[in-house]
Structure formats: C-alpha cells, structure tokens
Amino acid sequence: MAAEGPLTGRLALVSGASRGLGRATAVELAAAGAYVVCTARSTRTGATQTDVDDLTLEGTLDAVRAAGGDGEWHRCDHTEPDQVEALLRGVLDRHGRVDVLVNNAWGGHDHHEEADGEEVWDEPMEQFRAMLLGGAYSDYVTTLLTLRLAMGPARSGLVLTTTWHTPEPPAWVPYESSKAAKNRLVYALGYHLQDKGIGVVAVAPGWMRTELMEAHVAPEVLAGKTESPHLAGRVMAALAADPEVMRWTGQVVDVGELADHYEIDDLDGTRPHGNAGRYRPSPVPPPLPGEGG
C-alpha cells in the first residue's frame, strides 16, 4: 500500500526525474503520500548520463516504491509541446487530475562544461540556447499545457520550479542568464495566476551532492559545503502540503529559508544554508489591478 501522508490523494508530476534533484523530489513527494508521475528522457534502454549506474526513470520509480510510495514513469522531452500534451492527456485520462507540477527538467549541462577562466566572448554560444531550451522554455511549455488542460479548469494547483539564485556578483553568463529567465517566468506567472487559486513558486537549493557530483568531485571538496537533494525535495513536499502556500507565489525562495520555516532537516539531520549571503531577496508580485491596497 502506498504511503499515507499530507499529500495522500494528490497527484504530482515531476519532470527531469531520472536523477539528482528530480529523483529526490519524486521520492519525497511519494513519501508524503502523493502519487508521482516521473518524466525525463533517460530510460534503461537509453540514458543521457551513463557515468553512474541506473540514472533512469525506472530507477527512480524503484526508489519511489522503496520509500513506500507509488507512481509511474513516462519518457518525455519537455522541450517538445506535442510530447508534453500527449503525456498530460494520458495522465488526465487515467487519473483525472494534476495537483502539483514540479518543473525540474534541465539538460543544460549535457554537452557543455562550466566556464573555466576563458573570456566571456569565448564561451560557446550554443550553451545559452541549450540552457534556455532546457530550462525556461521547457518550464513554459509544461506549465502552460498543465494550466490549460488541468489546473486552469480546476482553479487549483501548485507549480514548483527548481532554480538557482542569480548571485552577486554574477558568475557563468549563459547559466546565470538562463536561470534568470526561469525566475522571471515564475514571477510573471505568479502575478497573473494569483486570483486563480494556483500558486507558482521557485525553490533555490544550495550546492547539492547529486549522484554525478559525488562521482566527479572529491569528497573533501564537498564536505561541509553541500546539501543532499532530499532537503529541497522535502521542502517542496512541505510547500505542496501547505494550505497557505500562496504567501510564496511568484517568488524565488531559498531552500534554507524554507527549511527553517517548515522545520525540515536534511538526511543527515543538518539544516544547511549554502546560499547565505550570496543572493538578494526575491521581489513579490504586486496585486492585480483593483485588488489589494
């Protein structure tokens, strides 16, 4: 039997769920009782990352069930509207609802390395295009179709987006700029949906010990500077269960701040604040015309 919890009876769709933060979020939502639809491009017959074994959708569903939850998986490229629409129509035919959408699909690093000292004008132009498509554009496609087919008619739902603070001072140009596009999308959607009963919140974790990070970065470099992706996953489960989640709508909120608010700890019992001092508070969308003071 699936886990019972604050999200029992609700359906969550998590994109980019084959590894890292997406997998951890799927597991934590399932542990809180949600039925989780896991999507990504990587399956056991074709994975985008092979440096670590079983970073696949099947592996994620195994982890969901090991946590006492249940769900299903579907291969989907979230930059392709036809694929996303077919996915959503299938989910709605089978389950009749989508209560929580987690926009976590990325892929911006699939073929690009982080800047390493070259001049700004020497960074490959293709990086920015890939990051915009894999980030803000895939978020836009998936969110609009979910609103159109599910949350809009229901006048309820929660859209969560995983992101990165735009730090001060700015760092890697294509990465920072593409994340800023994601964040502004959340702000704009939050503004326009605030009277529809649909929340839109971006969560910004610190430096995470994902499977690929642990495979490629020395343990002594990660020690004391990182958090597990389950901290952000637990925070998103708490947001999904919060009847007052609209207080955060349209904002980019730090995972450490949310962990303090909901009194949530990481897997090891710590509560990291990896972003402290490196970002500005997110702006709050203004009231719609004729509303508020």
Label each PLM-derived region with a short phrase:
Residues R10, G69-D70, R97-V98, A150-T163, ...:
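Active-site loop of short-chain dehydrogenase/reductase
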Residues V102, L160, V200-V203, M213:
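Hydrophobic structural elements of the Rossmann-like NAD(P)H-binding subdomain
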Residues A202, P219-G293:
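C-terminal helical subdomain
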Residues G107-H111, E119-M131, D139-Y140, R148, ...:
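Catalytic loop of short-chain dehydrogenase/reductase
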Residues T48-D53, D116, D195, P205-E227, ...:
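A glycine/serine/threonine-rich, flexible loop-to-helix segment
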Residues M1-H95, G107-E119, E126, G290:
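Short-chain dehydrogenase/reductase
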Residues L29, R97, N183, L193-M208, ...:
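Conserved Rossmann-fold SDR core element
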